[in-house]
């Protein structure tokens, strides 16, 4: 299940763990990424709080926790090669994995069609 937030993050659910990243729209707006800071594994995140930072030559932007949960994994490759987040944001450029407190909360997020309309 793929869902999107109004802060331009995407989540892909596998069981009760969501892979989180920024959308292609956000990556395009930011331009060439030069720095990525991710949360620590084991960190408890609350929906809406700043969880990560992506920085481009144009701007730095917080990436917000789309839902509440615990960070189970981070994409070290994205830290080592921030450009990968911009070139493949919904693939190899994922940021972190979050064990959701309540997986049913995904239902409150946008599907792909709703996000496409929102991001226009």
From Swiss-Prot:
Residues annotated as domain Lipoyl-binding: 17-99
N6-lipoyllysine modifications at: 58
Record GO cellular component, one term: glycine cleavage complex
Gene3D superfamilies noted in UniProt: 2.40.50.100
SUPFAM superfamilies: Single hybrid motif
Keywords, sorted A to Z: Lipoyl
Cofactor binding note from Swiss-Prot or TrEMBL: Binds 1 lipoyl cofactor covalently.
GO biological process, any: glycine decarboxylation via glycine cleavage system
UniProt KW Nucleotidyltransferase keyword: no
Role of this protein: The glycine cleavage system catalyzes the degradation of glycine. The H protein shuttles the methylamine group of glycine from the P protein to the T protein.
Protein family: Belongs to the GcvH family.
Name of the protein: Glycine cleavage system H protein
Species, as recorded: Methylorubrum extorquens (strain PA1) (Methylobacterium extorquens)
């Amino acid at each position: 299940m793929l869902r999107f937030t109004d802060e331009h993050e995407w989540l892909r659910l596998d069981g009760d763990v969501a892979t989180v990243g920024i959308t292609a729209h956000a990556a395009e707006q930011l331009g060439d990424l030069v720095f990525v800071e991710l949360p620590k594994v084991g960190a408890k995140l609350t929906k809406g709080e700043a969880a990560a930072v992506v920085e481009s030559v144009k701007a730095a932007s917080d990436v917000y926790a789309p839902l509440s949960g615990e960070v189970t994994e981070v994409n070290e490759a994205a830290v080592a090669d921030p450009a990968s987040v911009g070139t493949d944001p919904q693939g190899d450029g994922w940021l972190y994995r979050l064990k959701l407190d309540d997986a049913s909360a995904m239902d409150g997020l946008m599907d792909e069609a709703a996000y496409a309309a929102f991001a226009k």
